[in-house]
């Protein structure tokens, strides 16, 4: 039976930093995002180890414990695409901040709600702040790629609850509602 999602998570894929070289002097990178049964892909940026995508990908989050996997590939015309690293996106700290609900309305614009430190248990390369900004909660992350010699990916998370979504606060408290 198909379960209604808690909400929609928009992942703003901003850019790659110092990605590995997989062709002669450069790479043709693109990103694949996987969460549960959903797979999304960015466009290929040709001949660039510091690509700028500035693309938004939105995934339905049904189970907040299912990992979001980001994998970078090098596009090849004649052979299989080469893997250029991967990272898991840990959304648990972000979801905890969302559960603050109405308390957030009292915060000043630009206020950092929570700071997440890099550790062995996440793929962060630097501290990441979860911020209340213009009526939304966002989190900027720079992810260190695993299984590769170098490379980072800069993304931003943003949550949306629309019609047909259970909502993050109602899932933890049994039937609340959210307002925007």
From Swiss-Prot:
Protein keywords: Abscisic acid signaling pathway, Calcium, Cell membrane, GTPase activation, Lipid-binding, Membrane, Metal-binding, Nucleus
Residues where Ca(2+) 2 binds: 23, 28, 74-76
One GO MF term: phospholipid binding
Keyword Aminoacyl-tRNA synthetase among record annotations: no
Compartments (UniProt record): Cell membrane; Nucleus
Binding site for Ca(2+) 1: 22-23, 74, 76, 82
One GO term (biological process): positive regulation of GTPase activity
A GO cellular component entry from the record: nucleus
SMART domains in the cross-refs: C2
Limits of the C2 domain: 1-105
CDD domains: C2_ArfGAP
Pfam families: C2 (PF00168)
Chain's role: Stimulates the GTPase/ATPase activities of Obg-like ATPases. Mediates the transient calcium-dependent interaction of PYR/PYL/RCAR abscisic acid (ABA) receptors with the plasma membrane and thus regulates ABA sensitivity.
Protein family (similarity comment): Belongs to the plant CAR protein family.
Known partners and oligomeric status: Binds to PYR/PYL/RCAR abscisic acid intracellular receptors in an ABA-independent manner, both at the plasma membrane and in the nucleus.
PANTHER family, per the entry: PROTEIN C2-DOMAIN ABA-RELATED 10, PROTEIN C2-DOMAIN ABA-RELATED 4
Protein name per UniProt: Protein C2-DOMAIN ABA-RELATED 10
Gene behind this protein: CAR10
């Amino acid at each position: 039976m198909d379960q209604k999602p808690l909400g929609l998570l928009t992942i703003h894929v901003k850019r790659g930093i110092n990605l590995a070289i997989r062709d002669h002097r450069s790479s043709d990178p693109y990103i694949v995002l996987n969460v549960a049964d959903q797979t999304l892909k960015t466009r290929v940026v040709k001949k660039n180890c510091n690509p700028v995508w500035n693309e938004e990908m939105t995934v339905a989050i049904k189970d907040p414990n299912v990992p979001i996997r980001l994998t970078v590939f090098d596009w090849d015309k004649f052979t299989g695409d080469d893997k250029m690293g991967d990272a898991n996106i840990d959304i648990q700290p972000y979801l905890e901040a969302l559960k603050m609900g109405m308390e957030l309305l009292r915060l000043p614009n630009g206020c950092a709600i929570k700071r997440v430190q890099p550790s062995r248990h996440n793929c962060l390369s630097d501290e990441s702040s979860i911020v209340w900004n213009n009526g939304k909660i966002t989190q900027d992350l720079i992810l260190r790629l695993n299984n590769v010699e170098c490379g980072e990916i800069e993304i931003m998370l943003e949550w949306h609850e629309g019609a047909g979504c259970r909502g993050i606060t109602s899932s933890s408290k049994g039937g609340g509602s959210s307002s925007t």
